Structures are given as structure tokens and as C-alpha cells.
């Protein structure tokens, strides 16, 4: 899958848990943006291959995870948030701003499925698949995401000083070493 962008970065491995176990967020109807994030994530879970013996539960929106993601995105520092608690995290960056939307970000993460071998629980040599496995991790039930337009700390260097930072935090986390996602 080619992304219609000048440049994109996806961190090589979607990180698993940090510290502090987040409690589930209260059930509230998601905003239209939150719903768009869910609408981008849940088809990936429904389409996981090989098909899980029982369907993966649909993700719901976590306002707590979204708040953590938003606070981290506001830093405009392209790295994982060490203070995210026990949340998994996917991050992405693109430039120039507007060259990618939230569905494109999730689709980029999901496209890593082509490099994941479920039978051996490995990624193809030289490829990454941790973003995909976090999305389809069976025990992950909630997600909260954020996006920030940034004008400093560009991971693309001086050629693209303006960039976008995308962060999704997952509750409970996935990507435990040695475990399959489902």
C-alpha cells in the first residue's frame, strides 16, 4: 500500500505496557472524531487473518486514553510516551500536514498485516508489524487517539519543519513478547 504523502514515519515496534493500570473509562457516546477513530480500527479487527476462532470484540472509546494521547501529542516529540501507564501505544508522523488523515494512519498501521506470520508469531525480516498486532490484540478493548500539527522537533528534519503527530493509546495493552495477538 502506498501512502499519498511526501513522508511518513511509523515507529518500528508498537510498544506494550508501561506502568499504572488504567481503569475502564465511563461509557459515554464518542464524539464524531472518536467515532471516526473507532470506525478506522474496528474493521481491521473484524478482518484479522487468519480469522480468530471467536470474533475479536469491537474497540470502544476511552476518554482517559485519549487524554493521555492528546497530552503526549501536544509535546510534538516523535517517540513513545514513557508516562502512558499500562497502555499500548501506536504513533505515526507525516509531512506535510494534511497529507494523511486518521483513516490513513490506521490503514498504514493495518497494512503491516502483510508482514505478520501468525503461525510463527513473527514479522518478516526487516519489516515491522507491531502496530498491526496491537490493533488486533484480543485483550485490548479500548482506544483513545489524538493528532497534533507540529512546528518543532520534526522527525523529517529541516526539509519538513511542519508535520503532524498521531498517537493512539490502547487499554489493556498488547504486544506481550512470546504471545500471539489472539
Per-region residue spans from a language model:
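Sec-dependent signal peptide recognition
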Residues: 1-8
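C-terminal motif of bacterial Sec signal peptides marking the signal peptidase cleavage site
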Residues: 11-14
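Bacterial lipoprotein signal-peptidase II cleavage site
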Residues: 16-24
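Short, well-ordered surface patches within globular domains
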Residues: 29-88
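A structural signal for short loop-to-beta-strand junctions that line the ligand-binding cleft
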Residues: 80-81, 92, 132-136
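A solvent-exposed, acidic/Ser-Thr-rich amphipathic alpha-helical stretch
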Residues: 84-106
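Disulfide-stabilized extracellular recognition modules
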Residues: 98-182
Amino acid at each position: 500500500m502506498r501512502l499519498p504523502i511526501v513522508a511518513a514515519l511509523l515507529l518500528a515496534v508498537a510498544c506494550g505496557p508501561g506502568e499504572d493500570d488504567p481503569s475502564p473509562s465511563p461509557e459515554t457516546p464518542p464524539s464524531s472524531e472518536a467515532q471516526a477513530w473507532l470506525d478506522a480500527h474496528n474493521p481491521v479487527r473484524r478482518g484479522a487473518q487468519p480469522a480468530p476462532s471467536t470474533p475479536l470484540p469491537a474497540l470502544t472509546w476511552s476518554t482517559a486514553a485519549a487524554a493521555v494521547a492528546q497530552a503526549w501529542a501536544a509535546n510534538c516529540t516523535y517517540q513513545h510516551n514513557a508516562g502512558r501507564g499500562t497502555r499500548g501505544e501506536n504513533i505515526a508522523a507525516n509531512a506535510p500536514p494534511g497529507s494523511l488523515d486518521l483513516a490513513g494512519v490506521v490503514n498504514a498501521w493495518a497494512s503491516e498485516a502483510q508482514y505478520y506470520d501468525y503461525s510463527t508469531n513473527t514479522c518478516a525480516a526487516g519489516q515491522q508489524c507491531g502496530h498491526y498486532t496491537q490493533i488486533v490484540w484480543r485483550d485490548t478493548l479500548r482506544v483513545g487517539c489524538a493528532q497534533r500539527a507540529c512546528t518543532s522537533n520534526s522527525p523529517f528534519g529541516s526539509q519538513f519543519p511542519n508535520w503532524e503527530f498521531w498517537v493512539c493509546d490502547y487499554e489493556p495493552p498488547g504486544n506481550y513478547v512470546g504471545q500471539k495477538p489472539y
